[in-house]
């Protein structure tokens, strides 16, 4: 028998004995190895027995022997590959843990050599990168030799694979795993331009990761049912997984914290003017403002260095705080446990003073049954005031019940605005920031456009805000699936109310009403009218005039519909109380004044005075929409001798009836009787839900309402 045949016989005999007598099998193999020490199959069979018996130390020694003595055997490398895969695996099963333990028994030098050789045999870029990353983590001394090369390979792979989003497996491995190893190792020498390149890549990745649902999740989840303003977008509870990575590897804890740590390390390596210790975002911004003041005093090299410091520091403060603001007012855009429960908010001009600016001589006309409370508070300022002043410190009214962390949210809004202003305050900052934004395609970020729109509204630049809202609509169209007819998205409804508030601030009252009336189609009824304004409890009254205040309102029918009615009242009020007679506008005002009664009582009395001065009044929709008992009593009184015998044409076709017939005592009496019966019927309607009545008014009379403002 040949030597090869002898070896095969001995190995086969040992295999047969394994199930019956393990020790006998091992004895056969020990004998065989003594006889044929250069035979690989004998060594491998011994290793297999020990591995299957999960004897870590013995299996490790045998694997080491094979690695040293038979380095060219494919079976050895297949075994090593299985072990290194277990090292990268998140699984905690028994077999995986055994393989990890087996690897740990090997000498460090051998581990390092094994990982390097396995890496060389990987043809898949991602697998090769993960293998090399394993080496860098276990043997930090290898970072100097392999760290930058691995980082560049990952960035190159991202380009070659034509990844659409910065949130991809290659960028994630580079930013979260490789980059910290490189920049925190002071033996790795990196030029400043490479550090800035890496900081840029990290910032783009983390910002897109945090805000990823805006661009990614909506595409996968399709149309969302947002038939009511009140309903935040429904969201998937499934965890986000980056393609090519495991679920565990895709989750990043404290991404903002990680990003600012990278900023600090890069800053120290580039010799920026750094502060010791942890500083708030406000402190960072303040420091950057100071640095900008004496930028021109530096030589060109220092100027370039500090320019990068200001741009990157301010930019990250901007994006962090802009995100914080949008995440608080519209959490459904982003992932998070609070997303389904919190109602979104929308920033609008405050028109709650719509009932003000009325000066009345009460002695001219006071109903005998009406006693006005002497101490009733009057609103001091008027919505007619110029609200478009581009103030830097406008007051934002917000109800803490609707936004518990309102102080922090408004502070984030302020810091983001100031950061934005700083980035555009100097030409060289503007140029660099614009370059970065173009590369990152920030004009496609829906969440950022929401912030920018609110910022522009805050600044009082309403024409720009309208353009921004149209940009927002275009973004929503490119991201969202087509909606079911009649179910406008939450974003579409937010845009309508913000368009209305901007047109109003510009004095474009017909456009204001057009947007408001479009929005009325989305209102979900019934809404209870509690008499008092919905925003009244939340109002914190500033010491100075509040003509240019803003407010954050919940995106619910209950909050938005009263606001819409305020806007309409403000539009028609201006037309109704001019010197020119406009009974239609005056009638619309009277209908709208029913909301929050008796807050609009003074304005109603002004309307009554105007009617008295005219001596007559025609509004044929009166009995369709006026159900307020005080108003009905007042109009009934106007027809009496004591009330001035005012000629009122409030019934449909009443004018035609009188015009086309000879006015006889009988017909006049008939008209009076019709008026009396209509008034009695109307009194019986006083219990109707006022919001339903006013909603019907807006829907049914849309054409008439818009014609009145033409």
Curated annotation (Swiss-Prot):
The keyword Phosphoprotein applies. It is found in: Nucleus. One of its GO terms (biological process) is RNA polymerase II transcription initiation surveillance. It comes from the Eukaryota. Component of the Integrator complex, composed of core subunits INTS1, INTS2, INTS3, INTS4, INTS5, INTS6, INTS7, INTS8, INTS9/RC74, INTS10, INTS11/CPSF3L, INTS12, INTS13, INTS14 and INTS15. The core complex associates with protein phosphatase 2A subunits PPP2CA and PPP2R1A, to form the Integrator-PP2A (INTAC) complex. INTS10 is part of the tail subcomplex, composed of INTS10, INTS13, INTS14 and INTS15. Component of the integrator complex, a multiprotein complex that terminates RNA polymerase II (Pol II) transcription in the promoter-proximal region of genes. This is Integrator complex subunit 10. It comes from Homo sapiens.
């Amino acid at each position: 028998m040949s030597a090869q045949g002898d070896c095969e016989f001995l190995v086969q005999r040992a295999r047969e004995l394994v199930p019956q007598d393990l020790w006998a099998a091992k004895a056969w193999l020990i004998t065989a190895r003594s006889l044929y020490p250069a035979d690989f199959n004998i060594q491998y069979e011994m290793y297999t027995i020990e591995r299957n018996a999960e004897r870590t130390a013995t299996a490790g020694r045998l694997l080491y022997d094979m690695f040293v003595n038979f380095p060219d055997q494919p079976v050895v490398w297949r075994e090593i590959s299985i072990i290194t895969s277990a090292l990268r695996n998140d699984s905690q099963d028994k077999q995986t843990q055994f393989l990890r333990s087996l690897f740990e028994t090997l000498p460090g030098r051998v581990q390092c050599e094994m990982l390097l050789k396995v890496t060389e045999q990987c043809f898949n870029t991602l697998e090769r990168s993960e293998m090399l990353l394993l080496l860098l983590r276990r043997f930090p001394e290898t970072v100097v030799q392999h760290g930058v090369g691995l980082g560049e390979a990952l960035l190159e792979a991202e380009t070659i694979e034509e990844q659409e989003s910065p949130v991809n497996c290659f960028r994630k491995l580079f930013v979260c795993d490789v980059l910290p190893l490189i920049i925190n190792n002071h033996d790795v020498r990196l030029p400043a331009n490479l550090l800035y390149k890496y900081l840029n890549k990290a910032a783009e990745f983390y910002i897109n990761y945090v805000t990823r649902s805006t661009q990614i999740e909506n595409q996968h989840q399709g149309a969302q049912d947002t038939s009511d303003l009140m309903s935040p977008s429904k969201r998937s509870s499934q965890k986000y997984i980056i393609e090519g990575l495991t679920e565990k590897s895709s989750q990043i804890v404290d991404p903002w914290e990680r990003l600012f740590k990278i900023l600090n390390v890069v800053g120290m390596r580039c010799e920026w003017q750094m502060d010791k210790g942890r500083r708030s975002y406000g402190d960072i911004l303040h420091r950057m403002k100071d640095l900008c003041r004496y930028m021109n005093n530096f030589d060109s090299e220092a100027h370039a260095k500090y320019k990068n410091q200001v741009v990157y520091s301010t930019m990250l403060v901007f994006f962090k705080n802009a995100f914080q603001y949008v995440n608080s007012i519209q959490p459904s855009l982003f992932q998070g446990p609070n997303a389904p429960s919190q109602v979104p908010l929308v920033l609008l001009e405050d028109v709650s003073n719509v009932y003000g600016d009325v000066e009345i001589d009460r002695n001219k006309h006071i109903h005998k049954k009406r006693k006005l409370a002497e101490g009733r508070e009057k609103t001091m300022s008027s919505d007619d005031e110029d609200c478009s002043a581009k103030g830097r410190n406008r007051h934002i009214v917000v109800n803490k019940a609707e936004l518990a962390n309102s102080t922090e949210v408004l502070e984030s809004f302020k810091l983001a605005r100031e950061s934005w202003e700083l980035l555009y305050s100097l030409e060289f900052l503007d140029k660099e920031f614009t370059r970065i934004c173009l590369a990152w395609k920030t004009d496609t970020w829906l969440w950022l456009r929401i912030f920018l729109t609110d910022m522009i509204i805050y600044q009082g630049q309403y024409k720009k805000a309208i353009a921004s809202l149209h940009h927002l609509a275009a973004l929503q169209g490119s991201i969202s699936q087509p909606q079911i007819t009649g179910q406008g998205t939450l974003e579409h409804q937010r845009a309508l109310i913000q368009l209305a508030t901007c047109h109003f601030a510009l004095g474009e009252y017909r456009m204001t009403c057009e947007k408001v009336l479009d929005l009325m189609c989305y209102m979900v009824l019934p809404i209870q009218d509690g008499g008092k304004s919905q925003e009244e409890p939340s109002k914190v009254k500033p010491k100075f005039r509040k003509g240019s205040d803003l407010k954050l309102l919940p995106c619910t029918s209950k909050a938005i519909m009263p606001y819409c009615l305020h806007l309409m009242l403000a539009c028609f009020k201006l037309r109704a109380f001019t010197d020119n007679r406009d009974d239609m506008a005056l009638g619309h005002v009277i209908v709208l004044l029913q909301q929050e009664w008796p807050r609009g009582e003074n304005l109603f009395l002004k309307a009554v005075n105007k009617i008295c001065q005219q001596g007559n009044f025609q509004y044929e929709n009166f009995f369709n929409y006026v159900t307020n008992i005080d108003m009905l009593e007042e109009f009934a009184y106007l027809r009496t001798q004591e009330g001035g015998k005012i000629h009122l044409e409030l019934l449909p076709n009443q004018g035609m009836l009188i015009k086309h017939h000879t006015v006889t005592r009988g017909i006049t009496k008939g008209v009076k009787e019709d008026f009396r019966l209509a008034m009695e019927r109307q009194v019986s309607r006083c219990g109707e839900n006022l919001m339903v009545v006013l909603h019907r008014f807006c829907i049914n009379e849309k054409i008439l309402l818009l014609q009145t403002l033409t």
